[in-house]
UniProtKB/Swiss-Prot annotation:
Record note on quaternary structure: Heterotrimer composed of an alpha, a beta and a gamma chain.
Entry keyword set: Initiation factor, Protein biosynthesis
Domain of life: Archaea
Organism of origin: Metallosphaera sedula (strain ATCC 51363 / DSM 5348 / JCM 9185 / NBRC 15509 / TH2)
SUPFAM superfamilies: Translation initiation factor 2 beta, aIF2beta, N-terminal domain, Zinc-binding domain of translation initiation factor 2 beta
Biological function: eIF-2 functions in the early steps of protein synthesis by forming a ternary complex with GTP and initiator tRNA.
Protein name: Translation initiation factor 2 subunit beta
Length: 140
């Protein structure tokens, strides 16, 4: 190797040493599956609060979206369960939650789920914690 190549590799090593280390835990983030049961004419999502905490969204925002899409009434119990009036299949609830993830959680630039929802005046934004992008979304 020439002197120039050695200098190049030394500078490259210094650059990599100064770069922040990637957090592999946030890249391979897996979401819990929704635990959905039907009791009579009521659909209960047992791990709703845990799911909302994992995607960094308030329970009320997720509940508002899901109930609006299902055209149903519902409430969150003290132990974090979402109780929806009406009988809905797992596939329907999961479809709407996947749509919520793609619209209000996933970064449109880098596809990361490591985001926060920010309201600036009357405009809602998804701010990505991985790449720093800030994208407007439809208000909830």
């Amino acid at each position: 190797m020439s002197e120039r190549d050695k200098l190049y590799h030394v500078l490259l090593d210094r650059l990599y040493a100064k770069l922040p280390k990637k957090d592999l835990a946030s890249e391979t983030q897996t979401l819990p599956t929704l635990s959905i049961i039907n009791v009579g004419n009521t659909t209960i999502i047992r791990n709703f609060s845990e799911y909302c905490d994992r995607i960094r969204r308030e329970d009320k925002i997720c509940m508002r979206y899901l109930l609006k899409e299902l055209a149903a009434a519902g409430s969150i119990s003290e132990n974090g369960q979402l109780m929806i009036q009406g009988k809905f299949s797992n596939a329907i609830v999961n479809t709407f939650m996947d749509r919520f993830l793609k619209t209000y959680v996933q970064c449109s630039t880098c596809k990361s789920l490591d985001t926060v929802l920010v309201k600036d005046k009357k405009i809602w934004y998804i701010q990505c914690l991985a790449c720093g992008a800030k994208n407007p979304v439809k208000p909830l």
